Design a protein with these regions (language model features):
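A short acidic, Gly/Pro-enriched loop at the edge of an enzyme's catalytic core
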Residues: 131-140
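A short glycine-rich, Lys/Arg-flanked "PGG" loop and its adjoining helix->strand segment in the class I
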Residues: 154-169
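Class I SAM-dependent methyltransferase SAM/SAH-binding core
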Residues: 73-129
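Intrinsically disordered, low-complexity segments enriched in serine/proline and basic residues
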Residues: 6-14
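Short alpha-helix
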Residues: 208, 219-242
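Core SAM-dependent methyltransferase catalytic element
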Residues: 235-237, 258-284
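Conserved class I S-adenosyl-L-methionine
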Residues: 16-70, 83, 87, 169-206
């Protein structure tokens, strides 16, 4: 879970084809996620105490769409401070988690040791995963607020194909690009559906605490469904399934109302817009 975009912000758009070098963007995002990791691990939103006591943090969406993971090698991309990774490890998966934030990875390693689990955590840019993780996996997994931090999905998809064993599964559950078109309060459409430019935002707070002492610029990109699917297909993966969900399993947006336990709508748009999608793709 790496929710991210639109906590409390003002935004502007830049043409990233002109900007060229993304390193400065990745570094700014890393610094911001280092701040967030400290706040998030102590938040009610993540309920770390409940997780330590045995509660699951995975949602019915991914649990219903991924088969038994026992003894399967799983690579978790953009794992934040490791709760989802360690939940999969509890279910028997042999997990390696990757994240850009060194603070988050350090917290993940501490939590892994505290829980007596055997997951491994690697700090690197997700696009450089193949340079840092020298094995292939039965499952590559990523979820909720991850791909928006990447300017181009073709290198991402190629990396995924490289990291998968033949016959391996790639699975993503992600917030729907329609959600990212709106302003913070969901009053009007502010951003393009397609990946046209980098979205630069001045942030205050985070989705677990709008008043947290977290400030800084972040850089993100919107990705259409066709861009995601075509990147995966172009990498040689075969799409097995694509599903859309008319709710969010997390209250990480403003103006949300819980209409059923563990399911949230945007107030005034109840059941009218897709909020999450999932994809299963396999390496033949």
């Amino acid at each position: 879970m790496d929710y991210g975009k639109h906590p409390v912000q003002t935004g502007c758009l830049l043409n990233f084809n002109i900007m060229g070098n993304y390193d400065q963007y990745f570094e700014a995002n890393r610094e911001l996620w280092n701040q967030r990791a400290i706040v998030h691990k102590s938040s009610d939103f993540y309920n770390l105490a409940g997780f330590k006591a045995g509660e699951t943090v995975l949602t019915p969406i991914e649990l219903n769409e991924i088969d038994d993971v026992k003894d399967k090698k799983m690579l978790h991309l953009q794992c934040h401070f490791g709760m989802d990774s360690l939940d999969w490890a509890r279910r028997g998966a042999l997990v390696t988690g990757v994240d850009l934030s060194d603070t988050a990875i350090n917290e993940a390693r501490i939590l892994n040791k505290e829980l007596g689990l055997t997951a491994e955590f690697v700090c690197c840019n997700v696009l450089d995963t193949a340079d840092h993780v020298k094995s292939q996996f039965d499952i590559v997994f990523t979820s909720y607020g991850t791909i928006g931090w990447l300017p181009d999905l073709k290198p991402w998809a190629n990396m995924i194909a490289r990291m998968l064993k033949r016959g391996g599964l790639f699975y993503i559950a992600e917030f729907h690009p329609v959600v990212w078109m709106f302003d913070d309060e969901f009053t009007h459409i502010k951003y393009a559906y397609e990946n046209k430019e980098v979205i630069v935002t001045e942030n205050q707070g985070t989705y677990t605490d709008r008043n947290a002492d977290i400030r800084g610029k972040e850089y993100s990109w919107n990705h259409s469904i066709s861009e995601v699917l075509n990147a995966l297909i172009g990498s040689g993966l075969t799409i097995e399934s694509f599903n859309e969900f008319m709710y969010s399993p997390y209250p990480c947006f403003q103006q949300v109302i819980e209409f059923e336990k563990g399911k949230w709508h945007i107030k005034g748009m109840e059941g009218k817009i897709p909020m999450v999608y999932s994809i299963r793709a396999v390496k033949q």
